[in-house]
């Protein structure tokens, strides 16, 4: 691992939590003791509409002055969006957006930009969607290369969300400036083997984003039968040492696979304990302790069958 970062989405108000300005967030990450920051590349944080060269220079100085060196940019893309209207050049819009993010990354001294693939469109053949993503990532990587920046594909959106497909995708793009940003939480929630996936993707991965969860069952009451209908389980974000994802095993396997990148902590869904600034800070500080002190969470095998959301 090459540095522990805090993701600014954690303090963006995205799910009802307190909102910090980007400057306030930089100070928060530094005060908590993080090595760097992962910056949400949209309002209310690092929007390309608001950050030109002068603004980026000021922000970079603030990050440096607070003793942090590592920066990763969190982009937001969906290359399969609105395929039903090919007259609108959405793919071009997004590639141009990534090019602008590459400029921002260069100005901030960041080496990588997180990107997403696409959500499945039921009305469009899968192969067409896959090919659109491959060609888009390849062109985006060309643009990023002009600024000596790497784009990293996170396993977040529907397409290539499983580890094998993510590996296939990055290999098919076949570009030095397109890598993986493989996370453990998605395959863990899918009930997949995160250790074998980590060994397979470790060398291709430049950054990973971390959160831990506990799975809560859900039911709907059916008065007609005086009983309950089981619904898909709910993933509750919890402190790192209380979740079911075995991060010590994950990072060990990532290292065996060749991972040497950065790690960011995100609070991107409602937290156990509520949406207060104090609770956010407590979770973030707990992540640092968990990672730096090598805290290994106890494994409760009794709940093993509940780990998957399938």
Which residues does each PLM region occupy?
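Acidic/histidine-rich catalytic cores of soluble enzymes
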Residues: 3-4, 8, 37, 135-244, ...
């Amino acid at each position: 691992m090459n540095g522990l970062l805090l993701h600014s989405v954690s303090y963006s108000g995205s799910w009802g939590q307190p909102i910090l300005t980007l400057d306030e967030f930089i100070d928060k990450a530094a005060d908590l003791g993080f090595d760097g920051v992962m910056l949400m590349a949209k309002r209310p944080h690092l929007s390309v509409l608001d950050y030109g060269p002068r603004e980026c220079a000021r922000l970079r100085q603030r990050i440096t002055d607070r003793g942090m060196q590592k920066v990763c940019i969190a982009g937001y893309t969906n290359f399969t969006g609105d395929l039903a209207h090919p007259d609108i050049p959405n793919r071009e819009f997004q590639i141009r957006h990534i090019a602008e993010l590459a400029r921002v990354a260069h100005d901030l001294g960041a080496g990588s930009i997180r990107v997403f693939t696409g959500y499945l469109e039921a009305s469009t053949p899968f192969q067409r969607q896959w090919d659109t993503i491959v060609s888009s990532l390849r062109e985006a990587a060309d643009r990023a290369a002009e600024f000596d920046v790497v784009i990293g594909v996170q396993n977040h959106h529907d397409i290539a969300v499983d580890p094998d497909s993510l590996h296939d995708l990055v290999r098919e793009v076949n570009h030095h400036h397109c890598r993986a940003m493989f996370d453990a939480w998605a395959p863990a929630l899918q009930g997949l083997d995160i250790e074998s996936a980590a060994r397979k993707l470790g060398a291709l991965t430049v950054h990973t984003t971390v959160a831990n969860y506990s799975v809560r069952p859900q039911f709907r009451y059916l008065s007609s039968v005086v009983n309950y209908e089981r619904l898909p389980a709910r993933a509750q974000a919890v402190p790192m040492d209380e979740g079911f994802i075995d991060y010590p095993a994950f990072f060990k396997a990532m290292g065996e696979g060749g991972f040497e990148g950065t790690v960011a902590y995100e609070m991107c869904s409602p937290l156990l304990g509520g949406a207060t600034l104090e609770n956010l800070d407590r979770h973030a500080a707990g992540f640092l302790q968990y990672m730096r002190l090598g805290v290994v969470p106890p494994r409760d095998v009794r709940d093993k069958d509940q780990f998957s959301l399938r």
